[in-house]
Amino acid sequence: MCIRDRAEIVNQDAVAVTSAIGMFEGYEDGSFGPENVVTRAEMAVIICTMLYGAGVNVNQFAETSVFTDVPAWAQGYVNLCSSLGIVAGVGDGKFDPNATVTTAQAVLMLCRALGYFQSATDFGNDWMLAATAKGTALGLYGDLKLTANAGLTRDNVAELVFNALTKAVPVQYNE
């Protein structure tokens, strides 16, 4: 992908790799938009692509929506992530798909995609603290300096996902 705003990208390797494997696409003007925020719906798409590859067919998950506020383009991805226990709603049957994903939410989603936090009791009373600690232990943050409640940019999400792919160890279950 030819990126017009390459000089603005901090996490060059992460953006190059995650873009090459289909997690991110550039914009029509040739930019990547490294400072643009990632929504909760977009994060679900990224997670599905991380787990199943670009072009993952989510049509069977788009037929009935788990949440009442998810747009059609994202329904399959959000529903698949929900069925895997990777994402949760915000209450009243809502997902809040257009809200900016926070660091803590994205790290929790990545940890769950790697097999951690499969039960609500896995993180005790404070899911945010538990996700942050597990994300740190797994090396998801790398050199990123992020706060738990801060919204994430495309540049930073690329780095978190890149680290999940290259540094983190997925849970291994014994049969």
Question: What do the PLM-derived regions correspond to, one by one?
Answer:
Residues 154:
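Extracellular structured ligand-interaction cores
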Residues 15-24:
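Mature N-terminal segment immediately following signal peptide/propeptide cleavage
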Residues 157:
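Extended, alpha-helix-rich binding/interface surfaces that flank or overlap catalytic cores
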Residues 4-12, 25-75, 83-104, 110-151, ...:
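Feature responds to low-complexity, polar/acidic, surface-exposed segments characteristic
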